[in-house]
Amino acid sequence: MWYTSTRGMAPRVNFEGALFSGYAPDGGLYMPEELPRLDKETLRHWSTLSYRSLVKELCALFVGLELIPRHDLNGLIDQAFSRFRHRDVVHLCKLKNGLNILELWHGVTYAFKDLSLSCTAQFLQYFLEKKKKHVTIVVGTSGDTGSAAIESVQGSKNVDIIVLLPKGHCSKIQELQMTTVVKENVHVFGVEGNSDELDEPIKAVFADVAFVQRHNLMSLNSINWSRVLVQMAHHFFAYFQCTPSLDMHLLPTVEVVVPTGAGGNLAAGCIAQKMGLPISLVVAVNRNDIIHRTVQKGDFSLCEVVRKTLASAMDIQVPYNMERIFWLLAGSDSQTTRALMEQFERTQSLHLPKDLHSKLSEAVTSESVSDEAITQTMGRCWEENQYLLCPHSATAVSYHYQQTDSGQPSSIPRCCLAPASAVKFPEAVQAAGLTPETPAEILALEHKETRCTPMRRGDDWTQMLRDTIEALSLRWKGCVENTAE
């Protein structure tokens, strides 16, 4: 399996090359050159599998067994999911009035990113051990990615991780999950800015290809293909869990509602669709609605500011995985994708060509949800089911309630993806007039030592990041030389 840049100006790479990259050298994102097409018999067989086994089957298609033999691949995925709290890893909760919630948050940090990052970290370690290499991972987070990435690699001897978090823009628990990991290979920066602003120095560093190669830099944000690959399993599992039967001639459709920030889960769903999974996708966003405007009007343009909302992990204006979706729906047309993205980067405004907007509208529908609707949805779900939603999951369930209240019940099953547990967002739970449930391990974070380096407005964030990376490379080089002696 080969991977190509969405912008078409970088050499193709295998899975290992895509895994160890951030952006491609031409500024694009890696995508498979060809997507396998799944027939009905394969889908029927996969419908009998556990979530864990589904991930194994999907990864076997995209990793390349010459790189990771199947026996090793299975072992890595088993190890990745060994610390999840639910024996099934992912759990479907069936509530009243056709409300199906796929809980993706049973990992260590109570967020869906544990699923893809635990696997990605295992793949990294596999290649690093073989080659005796060191990498420095750079991650920008709006809340959940940072803690899941830290958790997946903390204590690793051949990985350093640098995380930039938006100070004051994520929940207190999210921040503590990052700043309380006081390990030699974990380096957390608190940025005086929002998640889009902290992405700028990261993108600037990755744009220096020689610097990236010299210091073995990589990203674990959802620009990393491995993240998107594992997230495809959410859609397959949601489909199989909500389909009454696959015995009919025409496979039934399931509607999957995807709360989205940077668009990794949405890109994964679009790829699953292209592979033959009969799902209808709905993207749910908060008031930072660039994806909603793109789907509805073809308007891929920045607003003046990122709006602070209760669904803070989705407070994003630049959903970079839309580039993957544009490329996919444009029929792998890298020339068109490159022209579109270069215009967006230049002007921060883009109107999709009519044919591309038409294809996007066919593949995806969308909904933008206010804070008021989020708290109302959280309250209603508790009242009807005694079930606590996180504010991000509530954006998906809000769409479900809109549809059921309209008096036109869906003729197809609907599954709402739940990306995080309500335990991470006590502030939002209280705003909904509900009582937070906080596990002992979360309460204990309050009393732990913290470590976080400030990145203040007026500081040169890019230079601070470069200096940190260079210092880590020097330290690793010193360790290797000492070991050799």
Curated annotation (Swiss-Prot):
Gene3D superfamilies: 3.40.50.1100, Threonine synthase, N-terminal domain
Cytoplasm in keyword set: no
Positions bearing N6-(pyridoxal phosphate)lysine: 113
Keywords: Lyase, Pyridoxal phosphate
Enzyme class: lyase
The enzyme's E.C. designation: 4.2.3.-
Lyase as UniProt keyword: yes
Gene Ontology biological process terms, A to Z: 2-oxobutyrate biosynthetic process; serine family amino acid catabolic process
SUPFAM superfamilies on file: Tryptophan synthase beta subunit-like PLP-dependent enzymes
CC cofactor: pyridoxal 5'-phosphate
Gene Ontology terms for molecular function: lyase activity; pyridoxal phosphate binding; serine binding
Family recorded in the similarity comment: Belongs to the threonine synthase family.
PANTHER family: THREONINE SYNTHASE FAMILY MEMBER, THREONINE SYNTHASE-LIKE 2
Protein task: Acts as a catabolic phospho-lyase on both gamma- and beta-phosphorylated substrates. Degrades O-phospho-threonine (PThr) to alpha-ketobutyrate, ammonia and phosphate.
Full protein name: Threonine synthase-like 2
Species in which this protein is naturally found: Rattus norvegicus (Rat)
Lineage, broadest ranks: Eukaryota, Metazoa, Chordata, Craniata, Vertebrata
